[in-house]
UniProtKB/Swiss-Prot annotation:
Name by which UniProt lists this protein: Small ribosomal subunit protein bS21
Similarity comment: family membership: Belongs to the bacterial ribosomal protein bS21 family.
GO terms for MF: structural constituent of ribosome
Key word NAD present: no
GO biological process, any: translation
Highest taxon of the lineage: Bacteria
Keywords per UniProt: Ribonucleoprotein, Ribosomal protein
Organism of origin: Mycoplasma genitalium (strain ATCC 33530 / DSM 19775 / NCTC 10195 / G37) (Mycoplasmoides genitalium)
């Protein structure tokens, strides 16, 4: 479980940091959940990149 120190009673910043760290931990656990062949791993990586591009393109248009 990630630990975050709250400095200067700044709870909002501490929550942001905690969410970011816990998300990284979940992604790492999900990635190592089972073994993927090299080609499959590359396809998964490309899918994730494509989703990110779509997300940021839709945000840029607003």
């Amino acid at each position: 479980m990630p630990k975050i120190e709250v400095k200067n009673d700044d709870l909002e910043l501490a929550l942001k940091k905690f969410k970011r760290i816990s998300l990284e931990v979940r992604r790492l656990a999900q990635r190592h959940e089972y073994h993927l062949r090299k080609g499959m791993r590359l396809r998964e990586k490309q899918k994730i990149a494509q989703k990110k591009r779509r997300k940021f393109r839709s945000l840029a248009s607003h």
